Amino acid sequence: MNTKLVVVFLLSAILFVSVTASRPGKDLERDEAYETYDDENKRACKDVFPAATCRHAKSVGNCSSEKYKRNCAITCGAC
């Protein structure tokens, strides 16, 4: 075999192994980012509609409606 081809193959193999070996640490960082994203979503949870509208929707049982789930999230207990 050509010597240059062998050298290129070995360097490629070494690079592949080093990149693959460093990935588990990256996955942990990505998981932490997802947890932070979930926390931010919980903090951003709010009622968009006026409080009286949300209270009325809850009292008549409309919280199962997608409209009220999204716009009265705190009152309807979506978050």
From Swiss-Prot:
Mod. after translation: Two similar peptides (OspTx2a-p1 and -p2) are obtained after synthesis and oxidative folding. They may differ by a D-Cys at position 76 (corresponding to OspTx2a-p2). Since C-terminal Cys residues are prone to racemization during solid-phase peptide synthesis, and if the presence of a D-amino acid is correct, it is probable that OspTx2a-p1 (L-Cys-76 form) corresponds to the native peptide.
Location relative to the cell: Secreted
Cellular component terms per the entry's GO annotation: extracellular region; nematocyst
Leftover remarks: The 49-Phe-Pro-50 bond exists only in the trans-isomerization.
Signal peptide stretch: 1-21
Recorded family membership: Belongs to the sea anemone type 1 potassium channel toxin family. Type 1b subfamily.
MF-aspect GO terms: potassium channel regulator activity; toxin activity
Record keyword Transcription regulation present: no
Propeptide: 22-43
Function field: Toxin that weakly blocks the two voltage-gated potassium channels on Kv1.2/KCNA2 (IC(50)=1.8-2.5 uM) and Kv1.6/KCNA6 (IC(50)=5.6-6.2 uM).
Natural source organism: Oulactis sp. (Sea anemone)
Highest taxon of source: Eukaryota
Coiled-coil stretches noted in the UniProt entry, renumbered to this chain: none
Keywords: Cleavage on pair of basic residues, Disulfide bond, Ion channel impairing toxin, Neurotoxin, Potassium channel impairing toxin, Secreted, Signal, Toxin, Voltage-gated potassium channel impairing toxin
Designated name of the protein: U-actitoxin-Oulsp1
Disulfide bonds: 45-79, 54-72, 63-76
